[in-house]
Amino acid sequence: MSKPLRIVFAGTPDFAAQHLAALLSSEHEVIAVYTQPDRPAGRGKKLTASPVKTIALEHNIPVYQPENFKSDEAKQALADLNADIMVVVAYGLLLPQAVLDTPKLGCINVHGSILPRWRGAAPIQRSIWAGDAETGVTIMQMDIGLDTGDMLKIATLPIDASDTSATMYDKLAKLGPVVLVECLADIAAGTAIAIKQDDERANYAKKLSKEEARINWQDDAEHIERCVRAFNPWPMSHFEVAENSIKVWQSRVEASSHDAPAGTILKADKSGIYVATGHGCLVLEQIQIPGKKAMPVQDVLNARAAWFEVGSVLS
């Protein structure tokens, strides 16, 4: 049996917390946790600890929350921990080379896609947005680049036709910890194999924006439907009708032909709101009007039928 690793864990959101929990149940020793400083949250804007900090405190693990690693004090504090390795999962801070070089075995990162396909901040969303058949988790040895380090372990998952970013996030949050613990076992045993990324196959998964999530009805129906799933739970695909912003939670593609201008409502009944697009027809199945929760289209039509009259054009 390999000697347990002394691990410093760096992460912030719930996705990271699930990986920390797996490490705490493994043979390895988590000697310290780094996480983002407490941030105001909720209506009262009360300073709130990250999910990672909450778990660390429950297990009496020392917590460090530097704003950055620019100071000599911050770098020295990490060095004093004498860690074998740092595990980084959705930490939210860029790590300078001096930090990457501090642990004996360097730093590894859990990335929510199959590298090098999607590097950057929004790989889960972009994989759905692009119509990829699968995604997964990559464990990589970190270098100074953006998700450019050598790959140590990859596990894949199919993207189902009904998957949203929310459902894929949950699936990867379950897969990632398993792959991480397996990878650490390889590292501890000295059997991990590092594979260089093919930079020519890399794409940048840029952050999502509310502007991008506004539906362009000139696009083809299949692309819009993928956007609806990719932008759920944020920033949510939306359109305007009667000067109201409507969020789309669920839709489907109808393979019917039409000659109506893009954005025109072709039909509206309990089966959905049928909207002409640049190619094909998009059927809205679940939407959210201002001040209400997401509802089946039938319920919305009972209250707001005038907004969705056949022949009217959505913007």
UniProtKB/Swiss-Prot annotation:
Keywords tagged on the record: Protein biosynthesis, Transferase
SUPFAM superfamilies noted in UniProt: FMT C-terminal domain-like, Formyltransferase
A single MF term (Gene Ontology): methionyl-tRNA formyltransferase activity
Record-level GO cellular component terms: cytosol
Pfam families per record: Formyl_trans_C, Formyl_trans_N
HAMAP family linked: Formyl_trans
Record-stated family: Belongs to the Fmt family.
Identification of the protein by name: Methionyl-tRNA formyltransferase
